């Protein structure tokens, strides 16, 4: 695999003013506040959905008007937003405990995020708002409670799927009614339930989603697997990963291969399932005909982009978000290198689209290659090839548009 740079495009901010918080609903998206946005998706009309993770909501930017609104979740207490009656919220005192212990038996723990120098995000308990894990199912999505949502996907009918990450569930907002329901996960941070109803199966920190007419795919990150929910039957199965956090198994059955914290999943037009195998620093693919897995990008090497003067490298550094364009190219957030890159399936080359390798904000209105990002997590691409980026630690959504 070789590397190159792409034809220059323009980078701009679409949503977020850079100040972490929750504000601006009903106004221009660029003037609104976001708080560590993670996943993104674009519907058939070009409207953008944002998993506004630290705000525990999903927001929508209207393609025509540029107005931002909240479509799922309850805004944080004290935040500036639309007046929506909320159920009582419980507070929890901070405790001394192992921040990485298994709390799956306690569904009312409060979580916050800590990040190490590499940008790895962890969830720890104590001291924040308690989020009721099952609050809102069967009612309006705007009154439901989410817990660090990390990914969103929209199907052909306009139904919205949400990776409700720290509730260990995937939820669905009906396009016609706005009602939210659970479609996968019991709320327990465990692994069980394959070949049975997805709502009776356990998933563990889902962080990526992709949906087709037939199935919903879930990056079941802490189970080191990719799961599939048949939309006709509701049955869940594993399509990749043996549960071991390791790298192994290319050119074998995907369910016999090892993944390490997969954070993203995407579908090609030919049915190929692409996986951001984050802690293996690779992009993997699963062939729909054979079920075999292969590595398509990344070599597992330790890599941090140092600038255009350095020798080109095919290595990735904890890729998180992934999307497939109508041209079959695979777009990815090379998160720890603060880059957006693209893999060309025809030429087998990997290219830099945006990012300088430095975690900062800059470059709006100019060459996308000179634009700075900070730990980008999510990426989406629309039918015209416009690329949307969750510039997570800059608390913005950036957009990359091609030049003539």
Where are the predicted features?
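Gly/Pro-rich loop segments of beta-rich domains
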Residues: 3-36, 66-91, 103-148, 178-205, ...
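Residue-level detector of Asp-centered blade-edge/turn motifs that repeat once per structural unit
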Residues: 42-45, 154-157, 211-214, 267-270, ...
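Conserved beta-propeller blade signature
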Residues: 47-49, 159-161, 216-218, 272-274, ...
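Short loop/turn segments immediately following the C-termini of beta-strands
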Residues: 53, 165-166, 221-222, 278, ...
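A short loop-to-beta-strand structural motif that recurs across blades of beta-propeller domains
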Residues: 56-60, 67, 168-172, 179, ...
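Loop/turn-rich, solvent-exposed surfaces of beta-rich toroidal or solenoidal domains
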Residues: 321, 333-337
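Blade-level signature of beta-propeller repeat domains, shared across WD40, Kelch, NHL, RCC1
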Residues: 375-404
């Amino acid at each position: 695999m070789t590397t190159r740079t792409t034809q220059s495009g323009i980078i701009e901010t679409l949503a977020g003013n850079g100040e972490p918080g929750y504000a601006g609903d009903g106004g221009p998206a660029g003037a609104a506040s976001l708080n560590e946005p993670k996943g993104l998706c674009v519907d058939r009309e070009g409207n953008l959905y944002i998993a506004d993770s630290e705000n525990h909501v999903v927001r929508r930017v209207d393609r025509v008007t540029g107005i931002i609104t909240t479509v799922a979740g309850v805004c944080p207490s004290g935040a500036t937003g639309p007046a929506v009656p909320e159920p009582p919220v419980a507070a929890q005192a901070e405790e001394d405990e192992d921040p990485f212990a298994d709390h799956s038996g306690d569904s009312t723990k409060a979580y916050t995020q800590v990040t190490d120098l590499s940008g790895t995000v962890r969830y720890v308990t104590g001291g924040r708002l308690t989020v009721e894990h099952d609050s809102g199912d069967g009612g309006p999505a705007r009154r439901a409670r989410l817990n660090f949502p990390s990914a969103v996907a929209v199907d052909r009918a306009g139904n919205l799927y949400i990776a409700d990450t720290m509730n260990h569930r995937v939820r669905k907002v009906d396009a016609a009614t706005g009602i939210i329901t659970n479609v996968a996960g019991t709320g327990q941070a465990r692994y069980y339930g394959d070949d049975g109803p997805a709502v009776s199966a356990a998933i563990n920190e889902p962080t990526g989603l992709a949906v087709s007419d037939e199935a919903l795919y879930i990056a079941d990150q802490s189970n080191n697997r990719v799961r599939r929910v048949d939309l006709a039957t509701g049955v869940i199965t594993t399509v990749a990963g043996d549960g071991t956090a390791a790298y192994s198994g290319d050119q074998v059955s995907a369910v016999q291969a090892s993944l390490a914290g997969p954070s993203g999943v995407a579908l090609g037009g030919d049915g190929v399932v692409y996986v951001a195998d984050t802690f293996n620093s690779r992009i993997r693919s699963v062939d729909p005909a054979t079920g075999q897995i292969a590595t398509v990008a990344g070599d597992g090497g330790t890599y941090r982009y140092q600038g255009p003067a350095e020798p080109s490298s095919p290595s990735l550094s904890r890729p998180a978000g992934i999307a497939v364009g109508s041209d079959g190219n695979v777009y990815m957030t090379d998160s720890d290198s603060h880059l957006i890159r693209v893999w060309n399936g025809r030429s087998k080359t990997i290219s830099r689209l945006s990012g300088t390798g430095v975690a900062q904000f800059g470059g709006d209105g100019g060459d996308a290659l000179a634009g700075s990002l900070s730990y980008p997590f999510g990426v989406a691409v629309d039918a015209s090839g416009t690329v949307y980026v969750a510039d997570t630690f800059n608390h913005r959504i950036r957009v990359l548009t091609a030049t003539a």
